[in-house]
A protein has these predicted regions:
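Hydrophobic alpha-helical segments of polytopic membrane proteins
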Residues: 2-3, 167-244, 319, 333-337, ...
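Long extracytoplasmic/lumenal interhelical loops at the membrane interface
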Residues: 259-313
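Hydrophobic, aromatic-rich transmembrane alpha-helices
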Residues: 2, 37-53, 163-172, 318-335, ...
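Aromatic-anchored transmembrane helix interface
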Residues: 33-41, 57-78, 84-109, 127-129, ...
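Hydrophobic transmembrane alpha-helices and their immediate junctions
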Residues: 59-60, 313-353, 371-380, 384
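Flexible juxtamembrane loops connecting transmembrane helices in multi-pass membrane enzymes
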Residues: 220-224, 237-271, 291-296
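Alpha-helical transmembrane segments of multi-pass inner-membrane proteins
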Residues: 109, 113-143, 153-212
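Transmembrane signal-anchor hairpin modules in multi-pass inner-membrane enzymes, especially those
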Residues: 1-76, 115, 171-177, 381-390
Length: 390
C-alpha cells in the first residue's frame, strides 16, 4: 500500500465523518453539507475515470445502467414531483442513490491505482467497528428516549450496518483468531439489534464464510476453522440463551417470527401489489409512476426493492434491476479462481440480494461495504495474480 496520507484514505475518512453526523456533530450542519459536496465531486470524477480508463468487470455494466435509471428518474423528480406529500425533499431521492452507489467506483479506481490494499483495511476496519458501535448506542439512546412507559427494548437498524462490515473481515483470512473474534463481535450487535432480516443475513454469511474458509484452507489448518466455528456457535448460543431469559421483547420477536407476523409489512406490500395490478396506464405499467411514488400511495416506502422499483420505474425498472443482479452473479462466479475474492464478493451478493427482498438495499449501501466491494472488483482485474493473494 502507498503512504497512509493519500487520496483514498482522505476519501474514506470524509465519508466516515459525514456518516457520523448526529453523533460527532450536529446532523445536517454546514460541515456535513460541505463534506457531502466534496465526496460527491470526487465520486463522480472517479466514476468517469473508471468507465473511461479501465476495462471493467461485467458487474459495472449492470451498475452503470441501474445508476443511469435512478439518475433519470431522480432528475424528473426534482423538476416535477408534485405528487409527493408536503415537506418531502425532492432532492433526497437522488442524493441517497449517489451516496449509496457512487463510492463503489471510487474504491475500484483507488484499488487499481494501488491506493487501497489489504493494509488499508487493517487500518480502517478497527475504526469502522468503533464508529458503527458508537452509532449503534447513539441510535439506541435516541429511540429509547422516544418510548413511553417502562419498555426500553427496541429494534435497532444499525444492526444492518454491522452486517455490512462482515465481508471486509475476509481480509483477516490468514489470522482466523482476529477474523472470528470480529465476526462474533458483529454477531453480538446484530442479535442485540433484533432486526430479523439482519439476523437472517448474518447467519447466512456466517455459514458461507465458515464453509468456504474450510474449503480453501490448507488441510493442516482446517482443524482451526472447525474449532473457531464451534467456539462461535457456543458463544452465540450463550448470548441467545441469556437474551431469552432476560429480554421479554426478544421472546416477542421470536414468537412473531414463528407466527409469520411481519410487523405490518404484509399489509403494506398488499397495498402496492394491488395498486400495480390495478394500473390501467400502459406507460405507468412499463415505466412506473416516478421516483418515490410509493410515498404518494401509502405515505411511506415499500421497504422492498422490487415493489419500490415496480411502482416507481415499472416493469422496465425491475428488468434493469434483475440484469444488475445477473451481472453481479456472473462477476462473482468469475472470481472462483481467486478464493478469497470469491468469498468476499459472495458475501456482498448475499447481502444485496436478500436485502432487496425484505428491506431497502440499493439506497442503503454503507461506505464500509461499497469500499470492500470496489476493492474486490479492483483486485479481480489486477493483471499480476500475486497481488490477488490476501
Amino acid at each position: 500500500m502507498k503512504k497512509v496520507f493519500n487520496q483514498a484514505n482522505l476519501y474514506i475518512l470524509l465519508w466516515c465523518i459525514y456518516f457520523m453526523q448526529g453523533e460527532l456533530y450536529a446532523k445536517g450542519s454546514f460541515i456535513a453539507r460541505i463534506i457531502l459536496v466534496i465526496v460527491l465531486i470526487m465520486s463522480v470524477y472517479n466514476a468517469l475515470v473508471a468507465n473511461l480508463k479501465y476495462k471493467l468487470p461485467s458487474y459495472f455494466k449492470g451498475l452503470n445502467i441501474l445508476l443511469l435509471m435512478f439518475l433519470f428518474y431522480g432528475t424528473l423528480l426534482i423538476l416535477g414531483g408534485n405528487y409527493l406529500p408536503n415537506g418531502t425533499s425532492k432532492i433526497g431521492y437522488l442524493q441517497q442513490i449517489l451516496i449509496s452507489l457512487l463510492p463503489i467506483y471510487s474504491a475500484y479506481v483507488y484499488t487499481r491505482q494501488g491506493l487501497i490494499g489489504k493494509d488499508s483495511f487493517k487500518l480502517w476496519i478497527p475504526i469502522w467497528i468503533i464508529l458503527v458501535t458508537i452509532s449503534y448506542y447513539s441510535n439506541q439512546v435516541v429511540m429509547v428516549s422516544n418510548l413511553s412507559g417502562d419498555n426500553r427494548e427496541i429494534t435497532n437498524n444499525v444492526a444492518y450496518t454491522f452486517v455490512s462490515l462482515i465481508p471486509s473481515l475476509i481480509i483477516f483470512s490468514r489470522k482466523p483468531f482476529i477474523q472470528y473474534t470480529l465476526l462474533l463481535y458483529c454477531f453480538f450487535f446484530i442479535l442485540s439489534g433484533m432486526k430479523r432480516g439482519a439476523i437472517l443475513i448474518a447467519v447466512l454469511l456466517g455459514i458461507f464464510l465458515i464453509l468456504n474458509s474450510y474449503r480453501i484452507a490448507p488441510k493442516n489448518k482446517r482443524k482451526y476453522i472447525i474449532l473457531f466455528a464451534l467456539l462461535i456457535v457456543v458463544a452465540l448460543s450463550s448470548v441467545v440463551s441469556t437474551m431469552l431469559i432476560q429480554s421479554e421483547y426478544f421472546n416477542v420477536r421470536i414468537e412473531q417470527t414463528l407466527a409469520g407476523q411481519t410487523s405490518g409489512r404484509d399489509v403494506l406490500y398488499g397495498i402496492f401489489v394491488q395498486y400495480f395490478f390495478s394500473e390501467t396506464s400502459f406507460l405507468h405499467f412499463m415505466f412506473g409512476n416516478g421516483a418515490n411514488y410509493t410515498l404518494a400511495i401509502a405515505n411511506q416506502y415499500a421497504h422492498q426493492d422490487w415493489l419500490e422499483i415496480i411502482i416507481n420505474q415499472g416493469v422496465l425498472g425491475c428488468a434493469i434491476y434483475l440484469s444488475y443482479f445477473i451481472l453481479f452473479f456472473q462477476t462473482w462466479k468469475s472470481a472462483k479462481v481467486y478464493p478469497h475474492i470469491f468469498v468476499g464478493l459472495g458475501m456482498i451478493f448475499i447481502i444485496c440480494f436478500f436485502m432487496s427482498l425484505f428491506s431497502m438495499g440499493y439506497g442503503s449501501m454503507t461506505i464500509y461495504m461499497t469500499t470492500t466491494l470496489g476493492y474486490f472488483l479492483g483486485m479481480l482485474q489486477k493483471h499480476d495474480n500475486s497481488k490477488l493473494i490476501l
